[in-house]
Amino acid sequence: QDVVHSFLRF
């Protein structure tokens, strides 16, 4: 799981 990419998915 990518937590950093989870909120950086913009």
From Swiss-Prot:
Annotated GO biological process: neuropeptide signaling pathway
Keywords: Amidation, Neuropeptide, Pyrrolidone carboxylic acid, Secreted
Compartment(s) where it occurs, according to its Swiss-Prot or TrEMBL record: Secreted
Residues modified to Pyrrolidone carboxylic acid: Q1
GO cellular component: extracellular region
Sequence positions bearing Phenylalanine amide: F10
Keyword Secreted: yes
Record family assignment: Belongs to the FARP (FMRFamide related peptide) family.
Function, in words: Increases the force of neurally evoked contractions in the major power-producing flight muscles, the dorsal longitudinal muscles and so is likely to play a role in sustaining or promoting flight behavior patterns.
Name the UniProt record assigns to this protein: FMRFamide-like neuropeptide
Gene source species: Manduca sexta (Tobacco hawkmoth)
Lineage, top ranks: Eukaryota, Metazoa, Ecdysozoa, Arthropoda, Hexapoda
